């Protein structure tokens, strides 16, 4: 692992390849926690059924970005919404199709880049993602503008990401992850690379201020910033997320924003 600058083409190639290759392992490790028909915002286990961050969903046209296996989109369909699930990875969309067969809940699946959404202006009432797309694109401000374009005036944009303060720590769920070792202001991405030094996984860091400026710059109004607390009785570990760290500082930030009505 290293922290270094990576070009846009290399980022796209790396992350598409990573999620295609890792899709089976990811679902094997996390599929039970995420469910086939559920909307889980984060490793802390906050569910949309309890949080209600999207507001009313019945009858709404909802786009799920970076949908993975599209459990959230299927849950939305079960609540009466009209969702579309989008992901860059064919491997993850294969799992989405398989889960649709298991549950009998089918939603449109689209393979596309979050920086070039294949939809008309104002096509959706709501756009959402749980840890999808935004941390993995080269230009997340441009992704915000694309979301604003496809969202109708008055529509809501809700997304969760790793809490920016987590980037000062090592990616370690244990004691080693309690000591600050990185500058919060170093925006160099987290990069995993092969033996030839070619990036195989890239994740971007932005500060809280960066995220707010991206939203405002795209024309959004921030309604809420949710930092889910680690729930009592939750002893699961997901990558760097753990009870030890979760009880001390936040691991997830959920931004709730609105495109102002004209």
Predicted regions and their residues:
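Conserved class I S-adenosyl-L-methionine
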Residues: 1-58, 71, 92, 156-191, 249
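A short SAM/SAH-binding and catalytic strip from SAM-dependent methyltransferases
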Residues: 125-140
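Acceptor-substrate binding/catalytic loop of class I
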Residues: 161-169, 195-210
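Class I SAM-dependent methyltransferase SAM/SAH-binding core
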Residues: 60-116
